[in-house]
Amino acid sequence: MLVLERRSYVGPNLYANFPVIRFTVDLGPLEKNPSAVIPGFVDALVEAVPGLHEHGCSYGEPGGFIRRLREDEGTWMGHIFEHVAIALQNRAGCKSVSFGKTRSADAPGVYHVVYQYEEEWVGKAAGELSLDLLHHLLPDELCPGVEQDADFDFEGKMEDLIRAAERRALGPSTGSLVRAAEERDIPWLRLNDYSLVQFGHGQMQQRIQATITSETRHIAVEIASDKEMTNQVLGDVGLPVPKQYSVYREESALRAAKRLGYPLVVKPYNANHGRGVSIGLTTDEQVIKAFNQAREHSRCVLLETYISGFDHRMLVVNNELVAVSKRVPGHVVGDGERTIAQLVDQVNEDPRRGIGHEKVLTRLELDSQAERLLKKGGHTAETVLPAGTIFYIRSTGNLSTGGTAIDVTDIVHPDNREMAVRAAATVGLDVCGVDFLTPDISRSYKEIGGGICELNAAPGFRMHVAPSEGQPRDVAGAVIDMLFPQNAPSRIPIASITGTNGKTTTTRMLAHIHKMAGEQVGMTTTDGIYIDGQLSVEGDMTGPVSSQMVLRDPTVTVAILETARGGLLKKGLGYRRPNVACCLNVQSDHLGLRGIDTLDQLAEVKRIPIEVASDTVVLNADDPRCLRMAVKAVAENVCYVTLNPEHALVREHIRAGGHAVALEKGINGEMISIFANGSHIPLLWTHLIPATLEGQAMHNVQNAMFAAGMAYAMGVKLDDIRQGLRTFDTTYFQAPGRMNVFDQNGFKVILDYGHNPAAVEAMCTLVDRLVESDALGTNGKRICVLSAPGDRRDEDIAETAKVAAGRFDRYICKRDDHPRGRAEDEVPRMLKESLMAAGVEESQIELIISEEEAVDTALEKCQQGDLLLIFADHISRTWKQIVQRGEGQVEKPEAVPAATPGMQVEENYPEFEPPAGQKVVRDGRGVLLAVDEEAD
């Protein structure tokens, strides 16, 4: 198998609504050699990856995939690769991974192998190891071009993968918080490779670092980290704490020991996880040795009175005791046969034990502390303990040093509960681990004694979510409920705008409407990321990384995200779901790139945000491919947009109570109207929207309708929608490269980024309407600077020229700055040839390769009353060229409002007749168009 491409998707994508990895592979000879015809292959594979027995595949029960491997000729290697990658991730600890699919690509023997992942690095590594294993098990003649490693050690590689996965995985505490958030449908983002996690989006977000939250006070952490100060602060309010001294020298330690009296505890001033702690000391020699051990972790050392009793961790969250665990130091139990060292090995065989915090329990170690306790007990590592004898190889019950935990939450005495809550409140911690020593947690400390030895600002949750004995406690849920109280939002409203043409203008319109409504808008477009109207990052920012940048910004109250085809194909959507999503149109552009060759395939890509939107999808009812997307949507509402007031399906949809935005004709113009739940809301006359050039720019009329429909679905007030549309203009500063009009010395220039046939057609139609209506006062010749991106299909470049042919007096054909794989003059020459083929005289056409020179030449040719349309690639440079020729922007006459048309949807209008092969589907959202599976 040869890998042609590797790609990972971070959100909803063409294959699934969750993260997946895709390997594109060429099977070569394996295309004709499925699993069952390769001698010994299946047995060797199942022996190496026994987890495959659990895969049901098409049979839906364990063992189903093994049947597929053996039955008839078996199954193909791409399918096997998919299942092995899933099984290896499961073995590496990614237990939720179960999804996979293998689909043929365009070429014979080439397949897309797709499978789910939890952690991207682990998913990729599992894929690579799966390939190596399959190549190792297959005969060399079936793997031409693949270098075989004669020393390949699969189990060794698998162990490396497991260890690497454990290092990269979220720790037990952080992982439990993430799971609790997912259970509450709260989105989360991992902000680094460790334990920094963001819950929620934008202004609604909260963050955690392990179990420290964004609500945790810094001064409280400082106090809890200072053991001496903690002891003093708690003692000052009458809480039970041991007497304590801080020392820096051995002689000071001995003097403090005499004052306190034996037995004693010696511990570092500011260490954690039980490091350097020695308890139950009864001699000066033990104190000196313990002092020096503690000095390895802290310059200052604490001595305190020893409190007898069991070690308990009491977890307080938001001033409530949520869990208590009795911590038992790491120990072994003799059996009369094994040595202590062998008993330690036996304990470490427990699959719950791992290194550090990677699992719910930590491995035991025979280190210096264990040796001290062995010596104190008169034992060595080779001692055989009598059956039933318990020997502690740790003096503290920390889980990080091999201890175990017993849940005792339900038996805690009320006095002890109140004491723990007071301790956390005294220091000021929202999440606090109270280390409390007492002989019996079910009896009051006031009766039998006890004391608080420490407070922890970042307490571990392992002992509570997965105790060795007793009931697991949802302590992570308590933290998430504190950060996001009941009914508190965790998401900001998200709008996703996709389609072929009009995305950027619609995105900017919608963002402007929200800004007028008082929101702090985060916006992604093809020219950059904007936060509250200010450019934050420049460039094409329409992919998943850009979306996440906006959603991470804590100042943003609403996210308006332009969603382009490229980002969806490369990495997916980048977040779980938008509230509102729209598809403006599906038109010929980018075909022949990244495996997308037809408009129907392009529609599948554009449909991704539509499928996952939660509240409303807004679809172009005048585009059949957009119309068909509605049936795939799970959103609560479907809103259609149409320029045709007699659209039969939309009228039927409105009669059913569905949502729509329609263009209605009145006596003095055209009115944008909103229909929702039986209501008819006249919104705004099109000639009052500056971006439409008095209603002449129909593509911007449509963009305004989409912006209005989305804003209405997002709960924006009608007056704010009207105000936003009336104050949005297509100036260079509000919408660069989107129908920017400039008046220079008596002639007009229109600058646009149109780069496909549909966009060029829209602008040429606008020019026709403007000239016909004399809206810009132009009566001279028309000039067009024409170009097309080099990575488009030949037929698309030809079509671009064809739609412009015959509509201008002169043409200047240029290329974009980047030829995108074509010769320097190839695109301009193709445009010229296509113009001439469409009837344009050669004398009307000029070839100027450089965009900069082409624009200068066109500007020089313009005279009084002329109109120049420039399709530019480098928008900012071209705009500078234009403004250097003159000043003054086109002034538009004040529009005169007309009477409300008062158009209504007639009850007796004929029903919509679906096209052949399709059918009408009705549900609570209105009327939808779907494929008729039963049609011939």
Where are these regions (language model features)?
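ATP-dependent carboxylate-amine ligase
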Residues: 9-41, 46, 50-52, 57, ...
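Walker A (P-loop) phosphate-binding motif
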Residues: 211, 486-531
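Flexible active-site lid/hinge loop adjacent to a nucleotide/diphosphate
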Residues: 535-653, 688-693, 757
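ATP-dependent carboxylate activation and anion-phosphoryl transfer catalytic cores
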Residues: 1-183, 320-323, 328-335, 339-342, ...
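Conserved N-proximal alpha/beta basic substrate-recognition cap immediately N-terminal to
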Residues: 114-259, 272
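Residue-level signal for inorganic ion chemistry
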Residues: 181, 435, 524, 562, ...
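Active-site nucleotide/adenylate-binding loops and adjacent lid/helix of ATP-dependent enzymes
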Residues: 206-368, 414
